[in-house]
């Protein structure tokens, strides 16, 4: 993640773009890491490694009520069931912290995981993770993120070498390290808090994959923020754009050029070829 990027949970991003909240940039957050009992050695080591290498301020608490995330995947996308999030929110209310990291097993079949790694497609864990972090963030109003823990079945498969194959480069980071907590802690370390600071008025442009349309898009459209749609980055979503007028870009390289042109005050049509003739308006 580059230095000028901000790590923001989805529901907080929605509210920010809708003008309901502002975001305050910080130098450091105190992170609370919540886990099911007992805290696993790999989880403790992950927290220790970020404290030693990044100087992160973090501590772990064990949940009194087990948190369960059950992933579901079909042609429409990834979703799932979250059990125990209300009890989690109640328990963490007794602690002082700035950001919350949740780490737990996501109940997904080994076959589903294997199909994802070998064939690509929809991340089977992402949907239920988003549901969990959104529910919690909405209630505690603090930066929140979830990291999966490897199941015992997956650990046994690791020992047998069943995961030793080449995957799509975009998901390679997920298979080379089975403790996913480090990146979450790194992101939450300086994640902006809800408070006086950046507002939707500071946003110049939104860049979106093709076919996507949700609360962030609607908020940007309402606020008059240009939306760049990257056509090469296709998803399972197929939202039509007939009602709006996005800026079309073939790829992210072109999108970067569009943003640079906007920032320099250059009309986009002037750098496209062929260049249209100047219009003469009749009175």
Predicted regions and their residues:
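Generic multipass alpha-helical transmembrane bundles of integral membrane proteins
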Residues: 73-80, 92-93, 103, 115-191
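Structural alpha-beta junctions
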Residues: 48-64, 95, 134-145, 222-229
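A polyampholytic, Gly/Pro-enriched intrinsically disordered region
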Residues: 78-87, 165-174, 246-258
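Metallocofactor- and cofactor-centric catalytic cores in central/energy metabolism, strongly enriched
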Residues: 1-102, 107-116, 122, 126
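Low-complexity, flexible helical/coil segments
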Residues: 19, 26-27, 66-71, 134-141, ...
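C-terminal functional extensions of proteins
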Residues: 151-153, 179, 183-205, 209-283
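Predominant activation on well-ordered alpha-helical scaffold segments within soluble catalytic domains
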Residues: 44-48, 130-137, 182, 214, ...
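Gly/Ser/Thr-rich loops at beta-strand to alpha-helix junctions
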Residues: 36-41, 101-110, 121-130, 148-155, ...
């Amino acid at each position: 993640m580059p230095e000028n990027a901000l790590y923001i949970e989805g529901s907080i991003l929605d509210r920010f773009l809708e003008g309901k909240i502002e975001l305050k940039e910080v130098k450091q957050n105190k992170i609370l890491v919540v886990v099911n009992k007992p805290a696993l050695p790999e989880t403790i080591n992950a927290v220790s490694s970020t404290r030693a290498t990044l100087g992160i301020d973090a501590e772990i608490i064990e949940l009194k009520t087990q948190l369960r995330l059950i992933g579901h995947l079909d042609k429409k996308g990834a979703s799932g069931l979250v059990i125990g999030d209300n009890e989690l929110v109640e328990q963490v209310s007794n602690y002082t912290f700035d950001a919350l990291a949740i780490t737990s097993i996501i109940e997904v079949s080994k076959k589903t995981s294997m199909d994802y790694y070998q064939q690509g497609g929809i991340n089977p864990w992402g949907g239920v993770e988003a549901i969990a972090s959104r529910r919690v963030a909405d209630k505690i109003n603090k930066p929140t993120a979830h990291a999966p823990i490897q199941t015992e079945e997956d650990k046994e498969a690791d020992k047998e070498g069943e995961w030793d194959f080449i995957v799509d480069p975009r998901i390679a980071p997920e298979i080379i390290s089975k403790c996913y907590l480090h990146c979450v802690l790194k992101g939450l370390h300086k994640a902006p808090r809800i408070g006086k600071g950046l507002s939707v008025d500071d946003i110049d442009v939104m860049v979106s994959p093709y076919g996507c349309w949700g609360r962030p898009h609607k908020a940007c459209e309402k606020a008059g923020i240009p939306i760049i749609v990257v056509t090469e980055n296709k998803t399972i979503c197929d939202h039509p754009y007939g009602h709006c007028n996005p800026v079309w870009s073939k790829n992210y390289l072109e999108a970067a050029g569009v943003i640079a042109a906007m920032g320099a005050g250059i009309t986009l049509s002037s750098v496209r070829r062929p260049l249209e003739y100047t219009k003469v308006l009749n009175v």
